UniProtKB/Swiss-Prot annotation:
One of its GO terms (molecular function) is nickel cation binding. The gene is hupL. It comes from Alcaligenes hydrogenophilus. This is Uptake hydrogenase large subunit. Belongs to the [NiFe]/[NiFeSe] hydrogenase large subunit family. It catalyses: H2 + A = AH2.
Length: 621
């Protein structure tokens, strides 16, 4: 590779190589290799998806109405989002419009996933990159209680005795030597910056979130029959409004008792995000900011995009409550419109991916996409195909294709909607709750700069939003803010559906085009959703009533992209650049930033290779 510059980053692979394989606490299988300079600063990063995508091949010649049930199995963590993208793609192709109740039910299910996924991601997948669990044993429960009441006075579980009980439980757990989910942590690493009391508070909330998350997904069970993998339907939703005046007789698919249960779970989630999740992220972010840890921005200040979602009025994108658009080349003053139908915008490339195109210098729009595997190691790779010691990033090195927007490597995810110019688009009068995004960001910046530092005796700062957001901390904060926003929107959806039902509209599906005989001979469509990890799109071509071609371009396809033919690096790789490491043999910093994207390799590449390793190997070369 030698040394070269791209997207404002200077890459140099001459330093020693650190290999993390697999990256754990994600969905799927991922490998990461970085090169360090003499000061242990990352100067080159190589992100690899080590699973192969095969679902598009499986779907060929299948019934389009069944596609959602196949693609939903891509991942059980971001469950439902692929099904929703799929039914939207088919409906778009066939010209099907869904009823209002179906739209509102889909909205509530999608937002339930956002809240649930962000909470589970932070506490159970990502928090351990910020929180030293063993350090919590040294905490003073009284001081922990005081900290809790400072950062979140409204949370009722905050007494010294409560934290002491959790600490005793944790102590027994640690002393048993069977740490379970806390096994193999790099406890004591100097990259951890929280005081013991903050660690105890976070571990306590880890346990609280574990209890609550299983209740929230019952919303999916009520509307979709089960979780994971709730049921969807081309043309609407399979649930039926009946017995709405009853108390919930056995066998009633949807009734007032169950609808009131949904409202209770929504309100419960709103309170937890407001009083626990968001305060924890703000407190942790403030302490790490105080330690100078504002790394991990990568492409987030340069190139970001989203399609836009959550329309207040279905089929009217001007009412999107999370607006779409793109920022390119770091120009925060201009929004580039994103059109998933434009063959010159969304394209996939395979120059450095283990796939084959007729002309690998060119990208393909998903409607014309090809998924043909071509697993070959580059000439500078070390090892064998079943025991790779080191990859050759000058050649093919990932099962993830390169997703690009108008030729640009992009970052997607919750951070996108918080960029000032994109956020400003939500302030259109048609976009309900639009002002809320601006208030969220401004209040969070004040809390991190002055509010929490003043309460904790830390140095106050005056970082701008443009300095705080494009960081690992900012990316983590964005998930919490999106969870808060989605919870509030979900309650609006519930009230709107109840009003619609009371007005006499009980329709949940449009089956006018259920029979293939009502379809055109050929059709194509696209469906997109805001998955917890960002922009998720499904493209379909239908011919003679069967799927002719199907392509998914999912969030981790964007963020996990390898290099393209021009040498541009993807969002994962860019985010690791210039990050200092305290102890390279314990890569906390790599995990912290990669986890901030909530990678889902199961989504971006769909079939695990049979020789996939099962234990974490960290190699320093």
């Amino acid at each position: 590779m030698a040394t070269y510059e791209t997207q404002g980053f200077k890459l140099n692979d001459s330093g020693r190589r650190i290999i993390v394989d697999p990256v754990t606490r994600i969905e799927g299988h991922m490998r990461c290799e970085v090169n360090l300079d003499a000061n242990n600063v990352i100067r080159n990063a190589v992100s690899t998806g080590t699973m192969w995508r095969g679902l598009e091949v499986i779907l060929k010649r299948a019934d389009p109405a069944d596609a959602w049930a196949f693609v939903e199995r891509i991942c059980r963590v971001c469950t439902g989002c692929h099904a929703l993208a799929s039914v939207r793609a088919v409906e778009d192709a066939l010209g099907i419009k869904i009823p209002k109740n179906a739209h509102l039910i889909r909205e509530m299910m999608a937002k339930t996933l956002q809240v649930h996924d962000h909470v589970v991601h932070f506490y159970h997948l990502h928090a351990l990159d910020w929180v030293d669990v063993v350090s919590a044993l040294n905490a003073d429960p009284k001081r922990t209680s005081a900290l809790q009441q400072t950062v979140s006075p409204a949370h009722p579980l905050s007494s010294p005795g409560y934290f002491r009980d959790v600490q005793i439980r944790l102590k027994k757990f640690v002393e048993s030597g069977q740490l379970g989910p806390f096994m193999n942590g790099y406890w004591g690493n100097p990259a951890y910056k929280l005081p013991p009391e903050a660690n105890l508070m976070a571990v306590t909330h880890y346990l609280e979130a574990l209890d609550l998350q299983k209740e929230w997904v019952k919303i999916h069970t009520i509307f979709g029959g089960k979780n994971p993998h709730p049921n969807y339907l081309v043309g609407g939703m399979p649930c039926v409004d009946s017995n709405l005046d009853g108390s919930g007789a056995a066998g009633a698919p949807l009734n007032m008792e169950r609808l009131n249960f949904v409202r209770a779970r929504i309100e419960e989630a709103i309170e937890f995000v407001k009083n626990v999740y968001l305060p924890d992220v703000l407190a942790i972010g403030t302490i790490y900011k105080d330690a100078g840890w504002l790394y991990g921005g990568g492409l987030s200040a340069l190139n970001v995009m989203d399609y836009g979602t959550y329309p207040r009025v279905n089929y009217d994108p001007t009412t999107d409550q999370l607006p779409g658009g793109a920022i390119l080349n770091g120009n925060w003053d201009e929004i580039f419109p994103v059109d998933p139908r434009d063959p010159e915008q969304v394209q996939e490339f395979v120059a450095h991916s283990w796939y084959k195109y007729a002309d690998e210098t060119k990208g393909l729009h998903p409607w014309d996409g090809v998924t043909e595997p071509n697993f070959v190691l580059g000439p500078k790779a070390v090892g064998t195909p079943t025991d790779i010691k080191q990859l050759d990033e000058d050649a093919k090195y990932s099962w993830i294709k390169v997703a690009a927007l108008a030729g640009h490597a992009m970052e997607v995810g919750p951070l996108v909607a918080l960029h000032p110019r994109i956020r400003a688009r939500a302030e259109d009068p048609k976009s309900y709750r639009a002002h809320y995004l601006r208030e969220q960001v401004e209040n969070s910046a004040r809390a991190i700069n002055t509010g929490i530092p003043q309460a904790l005796g830390l140095k106050q700062t005056d970082y701008t939003v443009k300095q705080l957001l494009p960081t690992t901390i900012g990316r983590t904060l964005a998930r919490a803010l999106e969870a808060q926003y989605c919870g509030n929107m979900m309650l609006d959806d519930w009230h709107e559906m109840m009003a619609n039902i009371k007005a006499g509209d009980l329709t949940t599906a449009n089956v006018d085009k259920w029979e293939p005989s009502a379809w055109p001979k050929e059709a194509k469509g696209v469906g997109h959703v805001a998955a917890p990890r960002g922009a998720c799109g499904h493209w379909i071509r239908i011919k003679d009533g069967k799927i002719e071609n199907y392509q998914c371009v999912v969030p981790t396809t964007w963020n996990g992209s390898p290099r393209d033919s021009k040498g541009q690096i993807g969002a994962f790789e860019a985010s690791l650049m210039n990050t200092p490491m305290a102890k390279p043999e314990e890569p906390v910093e790599i995990l912290r930033t990669v986890h901030s994207f909530d990678p889902c390799l199961a989504c971006s590449t769909h079939v695990i290779r049979p020789d996939g390793q099962e234990r974490v190997v960290v190699k320093v070369r």
